[in-house]
Amino acid sequence: MSCIKMKDNCRNFSLSKWQDTRKPWLILIIVTIGLTCIAHFLFQEYLFMEPCEQCVYIRFDMLVMAIGGMIALINPTNNIIKIFSYSLAFYGIWLGLEHCLTLNHIHEVVHSENPFAGVDGCREIPIYPFNLPLHEWAPSWFLPIGECGMDTPVVPENAYNHLNAFQKFFIGTPPDFENGLYSNGWYLIPSLKFINMAICCLIAFLCCFIVLFAMFIAYVLDKNKPNAKIFALAIVILVLVLKFIGEPKNPNQNIASLNHLNQVVLRYS
């Protein structure tokens, strides 16, 4: 009976109907907010991994996607709601992919034999889309305090005597902190230095894109929604508008990215 019931459920499942429910959007919210909270509370606050500029941008991108999901929860079947929810979700993914690729490039350059080649983006004061001063509104979340391309734990001296066994397992023991799982930076498999944080975030954004794009196509091709193609075009246009109008403008701030990178390399050399 259970096998027959599973087959019936699979037969009745429709991606178009599913994207009209709150479930996929709730999953999106849980994933994006969950990853952002893990980055802040676990890695930053508990394991002393200081976020760099691209890291805080990725947090912003995740929260943009979450806001899109929250809007969809209002009424996921409403076409106007869909315009804003899909647009914000795709916009956040677009930004996230860009920032992950930039972070991975910086990470590879800093850890290469020639760390001065090809890096041109490492600000101490971030510039968010639409020039939102998020680093002033919530500095503990959106102000970068780490060095570009370096995600090794930076433990303050006043915390040396207060580290528990769990923390020491990941960041090592004082004063050198060389025997922890993440002493050489965060990797999915630290012993092999396999898949760094930037690539893991990139995979997360790609997974979200694949699911959302499949939902979007199912919505467009739904024969029961004759106006879906018009609303889909509006979504594409709004994503482009958000991307190009939202590009941050910084006429007054002096960006010495290469000099900052040089300081990073000297610090860790």
Curated annotation (Swiss-Prot):
It comes from Campylobacter jejuni subsp. jejuni serotype O:23/36 (strain 81-176). Interacts with DsbL. Keywords: Cell inner membrane, Cell membrane, Disulfide bond, Electron transport, Membrane, Oxidoreductase, Redox-active center, Transmembrane, Transmembrane helix, Transport. Pfam families: DsbB (PF02600). Gene3D superfamilies: DsbB-like (1.20.1550.10). It is found in: Cell inner membrane. The chain crosses the membrane at residues 25-47, 62-81, 198-220, 230-247. It is a multi-pass membrane protein. GO terms for biological process: protein folding. Its main location: membrane. This is Putative protein-disulfide oxidoreductase DsbI. Belongs to the DsbB family. DsbI subfamily. The keyword Membrane applies. The keyword Membrane applies.
